[in-house]
Each structure stands twice: as structure tokens, then as C-alpha cells.
Amino acid sequence: MKRLVTGLLALSLFLAACGQDSDQQKDGNKEKDDKAKTEQQDKKTNDSSKDKKDNKDDSKDVNKDNKDNSANDNQQQSNSNATNNDQNQTNNNQANNNQKSSYVAPYYGQNAAPVARQIYPFNGNKTQALQQLPNFQTALNAANNEANKFGSNNKVYNDYSIEEHNGNYKYVFSFKDPNANGKYSIVTVDYTGQAMVTDPNYQQ
């Protein structure tokens, strides 16, 4: 009987020890699971923070690229404007040079007789008149072409004068007819450049 009691007591202690080991093992496993979950959660948090940081860095890079592109566009536009301004200045200079080189001061023909000057003597403001009238050489060529339509077609320029009427000016040109002694064609050219023969056979 005593042995039986002793055996039961020993069995109870053994089972109790086994149960305690099982609980400790469960607690250990639970702690491992909790630790693993915590580490996994921390990893996710770190990954998320890293992704946010990477996205922020990418955003900074994009903004920097946009800023650089904008600066490049502005520089290109400035360079283009500067080039256009230089080109316009060059064109203006060329136009001014051409205008200066094409300008011909009024002059008389060789051995000119006072024909136009005698018919239309001008005592007004010559500078003001010339500012209103077309280029002298252009007007002279137009008048010569018009004079050659009447009689001989090889008339020679003689002299010029200026006629003024109500503030409007005209050139008055005389052209000698080499085939008719003492005869001249009188041609006017107004401020619009219109040439007109007023007397094809003026006798000096």
C-alpha cells in the first residue's frame, strides 16, 4: 500500500513537471511569434519610411530637373531674343546705309541752260521741299522716260527747279532735244512720284 501511494505521488509530480514544461514551451513559442511579428512590423515600417524617403528624393530630383529645364528654356529664349535684336539692328543699319548710298543731291546737266529755273523760279525753303519730294534721281529718271514719249526718245537732261502750290511741291525738269535746236521738253514730278509732260516743245 505504501509503495502504491509512493508510486502515485511520483507519477503526479512527473505529470506536473511535464505540464509545466509544456506551458513554458508554449510561452516561449508565443514570445518567439510575438518577437517575429514585431520584427516584421518594424521591417514594414522601415520599408515604408524608406519608400517615402525615396519618393521624396525622387520628387526633389524631378523638381530639380524641372527647374533646370525651365532655366534652360529661359536662357534659350533670351539667346533667341538677343539674336533677333542683333538681326533687326543689322537690317536697320543696312537699310540706312542703302538709303544713304542711294541718295543723290539735286544737280544740273552739263552746260545747262536756265530753262526750268527761268519758267519756275523757286525762292522757298529748298530743304523743306526736298523732304516732301521723292528721291531726286528716281524723279529725274521718271521724268526722262516721260519726256522721251514725245518726239525724239534720246532727250538729254538740262536743269530743274521746284514749283510750290498750297504747300505742295513738284520737281520741274527740262530736257533738251538734240534733234531740235533750242527746244526742250518740260516735265513735272509731284510728291507722289507721278511724272507729267507739261510742254513737249518749249522753245528757249
Curated annotation (Swiss-Prot):
Name where it's found.
Answer: Cell membrane
**TM region(s), chain numbering:** none
Keyword annotations for this protein? Answer: Cell membrane, Lipoprotein, Membrane, Palmitate, Signal
Q: PROSITE patterns under this entry?
A: PROKAR_LIPOPROTEIN
Which portions of the chain have biased composition (kind: Basic and acidic residues)? 23-70
According to the UniProt entry, where is the signal peptide?
1-17
Organism domain of life: Bacteria
One GO term of the cellular component aspect?
A: plasma membrane
Q: Where is the lipid attached (S-diacylglycerol cysteine)?
A: 18
Say where the lipid (N-palmitoyl cysteine) is covalently attached.
18
Where is the organism placed in the taxonomic lineage, from the top? Bacteria, Bacillati, Bacillota, Bacilli, Bacillales
Q: How does it sit in the membrane?
A: Lipid-anchor
Q: Region (Disordered) spans which residues?
A: 17-100
Protein name per UniProt: Uncharacterized lipoprotein SAS2259
Q: Where is the composition biased (Low complexity)?
A: 71-100
